[in-house]
Structures are given as C-alpha cells and as structure tokens.
Amino acid sequence: VPRGNRYFVPGQIYHLTHRCHNRQFLLRFAHDKNAYRKKLREAVSEFELALLDYCQTSNHVHLLAFAEETEQISGFMQMVEGEFAQSYNRRKHRSGAYWDDRFHSTTIQSGQHLVECMTYIALNMGRCGVVQHPREWDWCGYHELMGFRKRFRVLDITTLLSLLACDDISDFRRQYEWRLNEKIARSVMAREPRWTEAIAVGSESFVRQIATLIKGRQSLEITGEGENWSLKEGETSYHVPHRVNHKESRSFQWDEAP
C-alpha cells in the first residue's frame, strides 16, 4: 500500500505526486492510463474528495485535490494506487512493487498559487516534449476543465471555482487558456521543484501557518520572496499562533488576460 509523507492539515489543497517503481514506464499504454482514470472516479466517489486537476504520464501521476479531512487523502491514495497496482499485476501476470514507496504531497494555497500549480501540471507533457499543448494529451484535466470532456468526468469544478473565488466558468476558462498559451509561447515550461518537493507553497503567512499546524515536526525551513514562498524540511522551526484561513487567500484577479 502506498504511503505518503504525512504532512497533512485538514481543509487544504494537496498536489499529490507518485512515481512508478524505479521510474519504470508502467503507464505507457493507453488502456492502462484509462484503467487508472477509472479507478480515480471510483475513489473520488468513495471518499467524497474534490479532485481539482490531474495529469497521468507514462511513469508518474499528478493529482490535485481538496480534502476537508486528512483521512480522505490517505484513504483515497490507498484505494487508487493500491487497487490499481494489484489489478495491473494480475492482468500482466506480474509481481513486485508498482509504485515507489511513498507518494509526495505539497499543500497549495488557494487563489493565485492554485492557478499556477494547475498551469504547471497541465504543461507536464510539454516539458518532456511529448506534446506542444495539453489539448494533445488525453490523460489530463485540461479537456474537462475546458468543457470538452462530457462523459466519465472526475473533476469537481464547483469546488475549484470556489477556491479561486471565481463565479463564472467562462472567465476561468478564458484565463486558464490564456495562461497556458502565454507560457507555451515564451517556452516557460521548465521544471519547478517547489511544486513537487516542498511541503507547502503559497504566501509567506500561509506557509508559516502550515508549518505551525504540522505536529511533531521540529526541522522545517521557509524560503522565498514576494508572494512566492515554500516550506520544506530543514533546520529551522517556526511558530505562528493562527490557523489557516483560505477565505483570505482566494481573491484572484480574473480580468488580467486580454
């Protein structure tokens, strides 16, 4: 059963990443990626968790989810990763590990940082040169976010819009498409380790609050500047007396795109 790094705080957005064992391309075939997405739908329904975005590659997955309770994340990942791995091994007459031991979770602040994380996830296959635009890759959230996928949907668009303080799905789609095209046009698609290696990403106040709420962790480090800060394992501990308030961080200007 896959295990996470257990940096969980209730009522947060999590970017979950997990690699196939030894970076093997165990998801390279379309029917395997489709089977994984089917298991995603089943697990979302089972644990009533809000899946906001995803991208399946040939050797790892990105899942962006919002959970009110930390147990939802653990149960969700055990069902998706564990049951899919067992099914795969049975079909392929295979034994041994399917996933690397632990999946990684990065807590993402709502609003601006959520949009940036979604953009990063969407451009994953472009970074490795497989496609030029996420519309060319079937196994990602782009098609559902843009309204192209009508059947077998897995994303919770209502919760996503709430976390972005956006009332109009058309505004979201216009801004989302513009951001993707702008980064593609400027070739701004380099890997950014903070989205997949940090414990939390957001404003300075947000990551400080997350650091306080992670119990039993004595070695944490906060780095960044401006509005972009990250929390990671390190040598410094922080104490902030307040809980995270997502309502203060959801404001996002949706009319920036031309």
Language-model features, listed with the residues they occupy:
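Short Pro-Cys-Gly-centered "Cys-loop" motif that presents a nucleophilic cysteine in a tight turn
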Residues: 1-57, 66-258
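N-terminal functional module of multi-domain proteins
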Residues: 62-64
